[in-house]
């Protein structure tokens, strides 16, 4: 492997580790979509599109055929990416992180647009006309220069169309399409295709497969012989059986390896994912290179995640998504600070700011996904009349609600931070007021809450007139409750980043010192549940409320 490939693959491995919480077993889903395509797709039309993509010049008529076929594929597939504008604000990400993201997207925009100005990667076309590009190729050929990027004709392949924006998101391979074409057009069984691509995917866990690797594997798996030997080019449809398309499909056949190709993005987790990407970038010293050429792993991941915040950025159909990554991701760099809160009367619930109608609708939509008949854990940090953190967790589905609140009693908060939750006041000043109260008031009727110690939860429910909700107190000892503390923090610590302070162990006479680990309401719920069940479940929890909803509305938006 060349040294640059070694560095590139090291980045890929680092990103796989850093985003492992968002990778998924997708083999069965991809095969389901493949079978749907095999049953309903007209492969005569597929062959026509494959042929037109080999033409040196493509017209509006050719583009219409490609877009029509893409629409049909999109309608047949379950795995797709949908249009979703992403807004990242101070709170979910720090201002420095937002500025870093904005800068990287700007650099990526320049790189992508420069590369797409030519017919091939790394060949700059500027604003030359089709005729000028052809003349340039002829001059270079007559002067004895090597042919451009393996193009046998020496002519730059271009789209001669009226509206170039119609090209956006019409390309890129999809594993289901790749597998369907290999099966139908290659006359292979789907099982043989799955086996061959699985072998290619296993190789991809340790290196980037190349053409030499492909030839060796094809001896054992003949279906891989249909993969084209041509180098991938931009603006070439996903119906072509390129090596990169086959590798992507192979990654999906593993159900393991934390492959980036299996990432699914949801609006509720978008900010957390971007934060994780930036952390890996910093640790590995990754960067966006403005030099023309193929995207490096960081650039590729950043573009795909920011293109749409809802769906399968690597492997799903995205032909119905409009715009580019820098069009669909908006960064808000405004930090309004904390408004003054009125004092709280003794024994009364805090008077919290009103939520916007839009936020209330989002919260209600998330609460609808709670199963009122399922086991539901609840925990808070802070006091019932001044809570600073709330978590509600349903282990069967993995769904959870997790939010914070700025305290009114700062002195009490600092004492609790020192000996319990370890949260810092500065990290809560931008949290959305009124969120905890609205959630408690709108919990599903008939829901039964399970808690470790019910007194505080009962008081919290009474303050919000929810005496209709029953509570089960599991009454674990301190040792029992924290039996799986380290395992839970190791596995799920990424779900919460507010507990940064130093926690001191309380000393009780006749007892060993308590834990110095901070108490997180969400992770405590998972710990208590693990103690009752006897093990820590590997299921990845799913956030029901968008991360940005946890923070105050901001005003000034900067579009990238």
Curated annotation (Swiss-Prot):
It comes from the Viruses. Transmembrane segments: none annotated. Residues 53-236 are annotated as: Binding site for the cap structure m7GTP. It holds the Pfam family Arena_nucleocap. Mn(2+) binds at residues 379, 381, 524. Residues 333-353 are annotated as: Disordered. Belongs to the arenaviridae nucleocapsid protein family. Encapsidates the genome, protecting it from nucleases. The encapsidated genomic RNA is termed the nucleocapsid (NC). Serves as template for viral transcription and replication. The increased presence of protein N in host cell does not seem to trigger the switch from transcription to replication as observed in other negative strain RNA viruses. This is Nucleoprotein. The gene is N.
